[in-house]
Amino acid sequence: LMGQTWSTFMDLASLPDSLDFIGNTDGAIFARQAQVRYTYGGWQFALENPETTVTPNTGGARIVTDDNSVPDVVVKYHHADSWGSLAVAVMARQLAIESGGMDDNTNGYAVSFSGKYNVSATDDIRFTINSGEGLGRYIGLNTSNDAVLDAAGKLDAIKVTGYALAYKHAWADKWRSSLIYSAQHIDNDAQLTGLAVTDNTSSYAVNLIY
């Protein structure tokens, strides 16, 4: 595959049955971008768009850079069976900035474990757990940036952990509901980011779909 599509690091099967396409916004991996991907059975190997989002030292408007010299590298294994599916993915990234006299890069990494378990022919449980340093723009609609600048203009990767759980139940042939919970925890260094940043987000949702 060559082109723009959902990130290989993302597991579409684990997204909840929701009126909102994402549904589990806080903890979900959600990115659509240019990439080159090779698939062999359940394995996927991808080189993806390496854009970096940065928090200025002590806070301020987000800086978006495309100064990376290497793409984001993703390796994923996905297994599907009659009982549901599981996916495990790892990602390695270069975070970089070259602007206003600043020229620095650092490494980022992330892991993801997600899946869907069929409780019955109509009911299922869906989950995702994602964690890493420099994961920011991939998770929770970029609630946290990938990195923050220190006083010397050097990048410091920000650690983020997100998770979500959803249960779908069918009441009748045309009626179904989902109970959804998701959360994200951001390990900000307040001495670098300032205090006007988000440390945690969470959400609950219940729906009835006809």
Predicted features and spans:
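Membrane-embedded beta-strands of outer-membrane beta-barrel proteins
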Residues: 36, 75, 111-113, 165, ...
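Detector for outer-membrane/organellar transmembrane beta-barrel domains
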Residues: 80-201
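Active-site-proximal beta-alpha loop/turn segments in soluble metabolic enzymes
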Residues: 51-62, 94-100
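Short, surface-exposed, charged loop/turn segments at secondary-structure junctions
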Residues: 58-63, 142-146
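Glycine- and other small-residue-rich loops at beta-strand/loop junctions that grip anionic moieties
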Residues: 62, 66, 156
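Outer membrane beta-barrel
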Residues: 1-56, 67-85, 116-119, 124-131
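Aromatic/hydrophobic pocket-lining residues that form the small-molecule binding cavity
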Residues: 31, 201-202
